[in-house]
Amino acid sequence: MPTEQLENGFSFHGLGTQISFPRGTVATVDGDGRDVVLVWLFDYRGGYALLVIDAETGETEEFPVPFPPGDDCPYASILSSMNRFYTLFNGYFVEFDVLRREYSFFHETAPRMAMGMTEDDDGLIWSSTYPQSGVVCYNPKNGDFTDYGHVYEQNWRQYPTTLAADDTGWLYFGIGTTLSQIIAFDKECGTGIPLLAEEERVKGSPSVFRDMNGKVYAIPPDDTAWAAENPGDEGWFELYKGERKTVAKHELKEKLFIAGKAFHFHPDFPNGKKLERCDLADRELEVSDPRSGDTHKVSFDYSSEGAHIMGVARAPGDTICGGTFFPRRFFSYNPKDDSWIRRESYAQWNTVVTQGDLFFVGGYGSGFLLEWDPTRDWVPTDKDNPESNPFWHRICTPILHRPHDLLAHPDGKTILMAGTPGYGSTGGGLLIWDRESSTGELLEHTDLLPDHSTMSLVALSGGKLLGGTTTEAGTGGEKKAEVAELYQMDLSTKVIDWREALLQGGQSYTDLCVGESGLVYGFVDRARFFVFDPNEKRVIQEMDSEKAYGLTAFQQGPRVFVVAPRGEIYILFERGIGLLDEGSFEIDLVAESPVEISNGGDVLEGRLYFTSTSGLYSWELP
């Protein structure tokens, strides 16, 4: 699709990718006895539809969800014994009747999405929900629906990712990730009972499994934040009638359900055939028949409005490059001939920046650092392949798991990556990477500001570094710091020589930018603009920018400030583009955007490039 010219000097160049992501895939049979594949579809809007694919012909039918997706999506789903497909997200429980090919029930619930789903011995459908251990029950035989609300609250967001019911009707789920807990739920009185004493709780998530003997077994957390999958010999519990009993390692004979978490893939058709592949990128489906040994491949199609773009930057060779998430794809746009290159990327490119003739990527998960040379052939990233391009340097998890800023230092050799820590943790680290030696030093939050994570960075004169923090913990972690701070580090010694919470009540320094005079401009919580004098260590001006211009643009790696080649500082707000007057510190909204701006941002050949949800746009500079 060629670039579309919009009003007021804006242009729409296309989508980063026109592929959706599967959030639960199951093989089953419809009411006519035909093999079908069900896929929950996810693009920038959220979980927008259920796709039903005829496994023989590739014919498809889409069923838009009967409620607003709200930028949320399925994190758990289950195909019941009655051949009905369930999920719960954005505060809505929904049932799809496969035999009749229609949504047969939906109901609003307490926030927000199911992390675990199961079916009990009476055929009741249960879900355990994020963020505060919500419990929902649905009876498909008579349509009775009960939302028990949040039954176990903490001051951090809980992930109740495994769920099981014993043969007496008691429900159990394990939660994490900040501290483990097992909840027994009594449906008769609608209460959740914690089974672990406070002193027994550790970081991570226990797992629960239903056994064929009618009881539920729980295993303790392993060395990850997520539900344990590789149990040891110690710490097992037998759960029955709401009580726990310590037992030796149990040889599980698990009662199986067609249920799973976000990326659940159930390949078995009732007639014995097997779904080998359902590829939304290539739009191909492959089914094998173990009896005949034959494999059948068909093409299919579906609608998609594309995945969220994380952020974009000018790459060497004068292209605009970036990445999308779910699906995780790389793209490169060349304005010279209005052409695109799109490829599968190595995980999620949260932050991107150019230094010299190389393009760097800071990514989620695991806090990885990549280096891409656009002059060489693309070789898919493999950390064990030294010929990879992009080249994999290292990971930083759990100290730094989700990058929020990637700074190309003006010394031409140093790359700094900062962000939040792994799941269930508080306080993120900082990677200082030396390109010349291909070595880096990873500082922990205790080396910086304990219980803070660095959200934004700029280089100051004299070998100093200025950082702005966020009080947000890692996903599912406990927030401990009360207010965000600015800090100054000596880059040679890696020592913090100044820190202060200058802006009262601020929770996150969204982005920072150094002006020609050496003053630093920034935003707090996307809503407050300030000017900071790094010599005097004080804020010399502050304004409520939200009131005047609305919130700034935002993504996991914010690029709110865009500096043009002649030094002009542009600011990306959701509603338009601002120009900063460095003399008066006033902001002039020079262009109202025809679309809501999501993130930046870079300048190339006289145009300022930015993103809006899944699309790449630009505006002609004056």
For every predicted segment, state its role:
Residues 43, 91, 131, 177, ...:
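Residue-level signature of beta-propeller blades and closely related beta-rich strand-turn architectures
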Residues 223-230, 417-427, 467-483:
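Short, conserved, GDST-rich strand-edge loop motifs in beta-rich repeat architectures
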Residues 49-51, 92-94, 134-136, 181-183, ...:
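A short loop-to-beta-strand structural motif that recurs across blades of beta-propeller domains
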Residues 55-58, 97-101, 139-143, 186-190, ...:
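Short loop/turn segments that connect beta-strands within beta-propeller blades
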Residues 595-622:
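Blade-level signature of beta-propeller repeat domains, shared across WD40, Kelch, NHL, RCC1
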Residues 13-21, 64-69, 106-110, 149-155, ...:
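Surface loop/turn motifs at the tips and blade-to-blade linkers of beta-strand repeat domains
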Residues 19-29, 70-78, 111-119, 156-164, ...:
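Repeated scaffold domains used in trafficking and secretory/extracellular systems
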Residues 36-40, 84-87, 124-127, 171-174, ...:
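Conserved beta-propeller blade signature
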